[in-house]
A protein has these predicted regions:
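Catalytic loop of short-chain dehydrogenase/reductase
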Residues: 128, 141, 147, 173-198, ...
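Conserved glycine-rich cofactor-binding loop
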Residues: 50-51
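A short, exposed helix-loop element centered on a Lys and neighboring polar residues
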Residues: 159-160, 204
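Rossmann-fold cofactor-recognition segment
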Residues: 85-103
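Active-site loop of short-chain dehydrogenase/reductase
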Residues: 118-119, 166-179, 214-215
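Catalytic Tyr-X3-Lys loop
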Residues: 137-156
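C-terminal helical subdomain
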Residues: 204, 212-268
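Conserved glycine-rich Rossmann-like NAD(P)H-binding loop of the short-chain dehydrogenase/reductase
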Residues: 66-79
C-alpha cells in the first residue's frame, strides 16, 4: 500500500546541522530515535524511485538486509514496484511525495523513518523534468525556479529530515545522482546546468562538514543516459557502484564513465 501525506511544516527549532551528536536522549525534536543498544532495521530512502536505477538500487541494498523506502510522485507505479520487491523478499514500501514541495517531502521521510526504521542511507536521484532541459535563451524564470526547487530545495529538505537520526546514531550515507551538467554546464540544458551546479556545491559542503561524524556524502555523475546493457551505465552496474560508494566511504565524486565532449541529459 502506498502511503500518502499532505504537506506538514515540521516543528520550529534548530536545524540538524546545529545539533550535536548525542547518544543518551530518546528523541530529537519530538521524533522517536532508537538508542544505540536497541537492534533496528537500517533503511535506505530512495527519492525518485523508478523501474530503472531506483529498482536496481533497492534490490542491491535489499540483498544486504536494508529496508527500502521508495519515494515517487506516481502512486500506481511506486505501489507496483514496492509489490514486486516485496515478492522478492525485500522489505519495501512506497511513499507518494513531490520533491518540489519541501514540507511534504520532509514529512514523508519522517513517516518512512518512523514506520520502516531509521533512514541511515538517503539517495536523491529523481529524473529532471523536460522543462529543465531547454536551451539557455528559451529558459524562463519559471523554468529556472522549478529546476532550483527540484535540485536544491528538495535535497535540502530531504537531508535535514534524516540528518538528525544519522547524527544521533553516529553514521549515515547521503548519495546524490546527477547527469553530466553537474560538472560541465551546457547551454542546451540550462535548467540542470544551473541547478545541478548548485546541488553539487551543496553536496560537496555536506561531504566536508559531515565526514568527521562518519556521515559520508557522495555524488555519482552519470554522463548521458542510463542504458540497459551498457558496461558502465546499466542500472545494475550503477547500483553496484552506489553500493561501493556507500561501503568504501572515501571520495566525494565518482564518474560512471568518462565525460564526452558533448553533454547529454535524460528527463522524465
Amino acid at each position: 500500500m502506498v502511503h500518502r501525506f499532505a504537506a506538514t511544516i515540521l516543528p520550529d527549532g534548530p536545524s540538524a546541522l546545529d545539533l550535536p551528536c548525542q547518544v543518551n536522549r530518546p528523541s530529537v525534536e519530538g521524533y522517536p530515535i532508537p538508542t544505540l543498544e536497541e537492534p533496528h532495521v537500517t533503511t535506505i530512502a530512495i527519492v525518485g524511485a523508478g523501474r530503472g536505477l531506483g529498482a536496481a538500487v533497492a534490490r542491491r541494498f535489499g540483498r544486504e538486509g536494508h529496508a527500502v523506502a521508495l519515494l515517487a510522485r506516481n502512486a500506481e507505479r511506486v505501489d507496483a514496484l514496492a509489490a514486486d520487491l516485496q515478492a522478492e523478499g525485500i522489505d519495501a514500501r512506497g511513499w507518494v511525495t513531490d520533491v518540489r514541495d519541501p514540507d511534504a517531502l520532509a514529512r514523508t521521510l519522517e513517516q518512512a523513518n518512523e514506520t520502516q526504521g531509521p533512514v541511515e542511507v538517503l539517495q536523491y536521484s529523481p529524473l529532471p523534468q523536460k522543462s529543465f532541459l531547454r536551451p539557455l535563451l528559451e529558459t524562463t524564470v519559471d523554468d529556472a525556479r522549478g529546476a532550483i526547487e527540484f535540485s536544491v530545495y528538495g535535497p535540502l529538505a530531504a537531508v535535514h529530515s534524516v540528518l538528525q537520526n544519522m547524527r544521533f546514531v553516529g553514521k549515515g550515507t547521503v548519495l546524490f545522482v546527477n547527469g553530466g551538467t553537474a560538472v560541465r554546464p551546457a547551454p542546451k540544458f540550462a535548467g540542470t546546468s544551473l541547478s545541478f551546479a548548485a546541488q553539487s556545491a551543496y553536496a560537496q559542503m555536506l561531504h566536508d562538514t559531515l565526514a568527521p561524524e562518519d556521515i559520508h556524502v557522495a555524488q555519482l555523475v552519470i554522463p548521458g543516459a542510463i542504458e540497459e546493457g551498457h558496461p558502465q551505465k546499466d542500472p545494475e552496474v550503477l547500483a553496484e557502484t552506489l553500493w561501493s560508494m556507500h561501503t568504501r566511504r572515501d571520495e566525494f565524486r565518482v564518474f560512471a564513465t568518462e565525460m564526452d565532449d558533448e553533454v547529454r541529459e535524460t528527463a522524465t
